């Protein structure tokens, strides 16, 4: 993350990399604490949008969730924005995208929150998630995808992190990792089709992004990931949707498929793609690493997670790539840091191996 704590921590990266090269691939790598598995819930897409999250919410203390919402909003939202958005939401509720707005209303009714608070906390995440995402191909042509999600408010959000299977007609449509009360997705998998993660591309203040969403009808970043997981039939369709749909903020979308060379980093402007960066394994580019900075630009020394990740992947080697070794790469400091909420590794060709670990658990 681009914070003073992480910037200072990055000075130890060279020592960490030296240790990395001394470790065997079978040994655990530089974990501060043992990670934990988040709870798994089913969300029925056959249920009414207002009701579909309630079975999951019943496993959580409403007071704790409300306190987390208040913390995020209080830290991220100026009071004048809160008052203005409260008025706007009431006027334009019918124009906000479905089923997301109805789902947020159902969550708010259960938690005794206003719709404005629910919309605000969902949009507040849109421009605050620092991350590392990797898509890679092994020597047999198998595609692997991993991500760390770094975010403030870790003490609360680690307790609200969950894996969710979205089910329709008794079948799993897609699997994702999210926070309780949050209807968008930053990490997800459509089985036997594709995987997606989103990384923040820091441009503009987030409340400007929110206003754009409400006034222009553009899609929030995380809502488009969920829409793509719901509707896209294959890797190519997913890439097209993620590249072309107007957004409320800039972002990096990382997509993995099921066939050789099906891996890409999409650098997004609000209006469309700024760059498409695919895997090119025939020319030695068997992985792509994205860490919140345009790949064609040097990363700032204060927040260089890219170089340690690349060195760890090269130390691993294409022939030894697997979900397990990719998890190890994502566990190397400062790729893994004090702000890391969770790590997910996934492969759409092997959907049952989707795995999330909560990091830095208290």
UniProtKB/Swiss-Prot annotation:
UniProt-listed Gene3D superfamilies: Penicillin V Acylase, Chain A
Keywords: Autocatalytic cleavage, Fatty acid metabolism, Glycoprotein, Hydrolase, Lipid degradation, Lipid metabolism, Lysosome, Membrane, Signal, Zymogen
Signal peptide (residue range): 1-33
One record GO biological process: N-acylphosphatidylethanolamine metabolic process
Reactions catalysed, as given in the entry: N-hexadecanoylethanolamine + H2O = ethanolamine + hexadecanoate; an N-(long-chain fatty acyl)ethanolamine + H2O = a long-chain fatty acid + ethanolamine; N-dodecanoylethanolamine + H2O = dodecanoate + ethanolamine; N-tetradecanoylethanolamine + H2O = tetradecanoate + ethanolamine
Domain of life: Eukaryota
EC annotation from Swiss-Prot or TrEMBL: 3.5.1.60, 3.5.1.23
Catalytic machinery residues: 131 (nucleophile)
Activity control mechanisms: Stimulated by DTT. Polysorbate 20 (Tween 20) is inhibitory. Stimulated by endogenous phospholipids such as choline- or ethanolamine-containing phospholipids, and dihydrolipoic acid.
Glycosylation sites: 42, 112, 314, 338
Record GO cellular component, one term: cytoplasm
pH dependence comment: Optimum pH is 5 with N-palmitoylethanolamine as substrate.
Any Pfam family hit: NAAA-beta
GO terms assigned for molecular function: DNA-binding transcription factor binding; fatty acid amide hydrolase activity; hydrolase activity, acting on carbon-nitrogen (but not peptide) bonds; N-(long-chain-acyl)ethanolamine deacylase activity; N-acylsphingosine amidohydrolase activity
Principal EC category: hydrolase
The keyword Ribosomal protein belongs to this UniProt entry's keyword annotation: no
Chain positions of site Important for enzyme activity: 147, 292
Subcellular location: Lysosome; Membrane
Topology with respect to the bilayer: Peripheral membrane protein
Subunit structure: Heterodimer of an alpha and a beta subunit, produced by autocatalytic cleavage.
Chain's role: Degrades bioactive fatty acid amides to their corresponding acids, with the following preference: N-palmitoylethanolamine > N-myristoylethanolamine > N-stearoylethanolamine > N-oleoylethanolamine > N-linoleoylethanolamine > N-arachidonoylethanolamine.
Stated family: Belongs to the acid ceramidase family.
Full protein name: N-acylethanolamine-hydrolyzing acid amidase
Organism: Rattus norvegicus
């Amino acid at each position: 993350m681009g914070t003073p704590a992480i910037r200072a921590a990055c000075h130890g990266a060279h020592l960490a990399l030296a240790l990395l090269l001394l470790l065997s691939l079978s040994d655990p790598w530089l974990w501060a604490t043992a990670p934990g598995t988040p709870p798994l819930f089913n969300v029925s897409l056959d249920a009414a949008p207002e009701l579909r999250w309630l079975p999951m919410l019943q496993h959580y203390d409403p007071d704790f969730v409300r306190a987390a919402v208040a913390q995020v909003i209080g830290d991220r939202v100026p009071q004048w924005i809160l008052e203005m958005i409260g008025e706007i939401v009431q006027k334009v509720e019918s124009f906000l995208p479905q089923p997301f707005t109805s789902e947020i209303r159902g969550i708010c009714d259960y938690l005794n929150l206003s719709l404005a608070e629910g919309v605000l906390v969902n949009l507040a995440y849109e421009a605050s998630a620092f991350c590392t995402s990797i898509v890679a191909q092994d020597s047999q042509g198998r595609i692997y995808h991993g991500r760390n999600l770094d975010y403030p408010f870790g003490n609360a959000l680690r307790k609200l992190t969950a894996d969710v299977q979205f089910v329709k007609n008794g079948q799993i449509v897609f699997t994702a990792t999210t926070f309780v009360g949050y209807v968008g997705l930053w990490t997800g998998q459509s089985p036997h089709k594709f995987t997606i993660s989103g990384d923040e591309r820091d441009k503009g203040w987030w409340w400007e992004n929110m206003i754009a969403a409400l006034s222009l009808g553009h899609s929030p970043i995380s809502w488009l990931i969920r829409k793509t997981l719901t509707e896209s039939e294959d890797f190519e369709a997913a890439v097209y949707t993620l590249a072309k749909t107007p957004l409320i903020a800039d972002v990096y979308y990382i997509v993995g498929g099921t066939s050789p060379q099906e891996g890409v980093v999409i650098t997004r402007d609000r209006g469309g793609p700024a760059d498409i960066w695919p895997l090119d394994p025939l020319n030695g580019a068997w992985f792509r690493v994205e860490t919140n900075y345009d790949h064609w630009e040097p990363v700032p020394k204060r927040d260089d997670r890219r170089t340690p990740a690349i060195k760890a992947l090269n130390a691993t080697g294409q022939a030894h790539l697997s979900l397990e070794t990719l998890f190890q790469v994502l566990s190397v400091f400062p790729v893994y840091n004090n702000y890391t909420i969770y790590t997910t590794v996934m492969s759409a060709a092997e959907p049952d191996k989707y795995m999330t670990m909560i990091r830095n658990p208290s």
